[in-house]
């Protein structure tokens, strides 16, 4: 059961700034790191820890919540920005095991 949510990111798939983006939002974030944003993700706290989306910034995002053991992972859809962090779960990285994976029908 989860009783608290942490916003771990609130930007579009690649975060901000994005590679090759010349819009003011990205240019400003390059000049001021306080304006940078990580890709959208949520941490679910309670008896265990759940993660919604596995982004490219998963290391920084989990550091924000003291690197909890992940019991559940939700992937809402298969855009690259929502799944890029999956490689970090493998043996060569964090060697995660026994994580319950929840996916939308579009992912299957």
Regions from the PLM with identified roles:
Residues 2-64:
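Conserved beta-strand hairpin/beta-sheet module of binuclear metal-dependent hydrolase folds
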Residues 103-107:
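Conserved Walker A/P-loop ATP-binding site and its immediately adjacent core
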């Amino acid at each position: 059961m989860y009783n608290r949510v942490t916003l771990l990111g609130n930007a579009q798939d690649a975060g901000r700034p994005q590679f090759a983006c010349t819009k003011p939002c990205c240019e400003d974030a390059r000049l001021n790191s306080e304006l940078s944003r990580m890709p959208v993700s949520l941490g679910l706290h309670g008896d265990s820890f759940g993660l919604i989306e596995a982004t490219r910034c998963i290391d920084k995002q989990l550091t924000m919540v003291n690197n909890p053991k992940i019991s559940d992972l939700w992937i809402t859809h298969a855009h690259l920005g929502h799944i890029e962090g999956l490689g970090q779960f493998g043996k060569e990285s964090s060697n995660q095991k026994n994580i319950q994976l929840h996916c939308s029908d579009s992912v299957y």
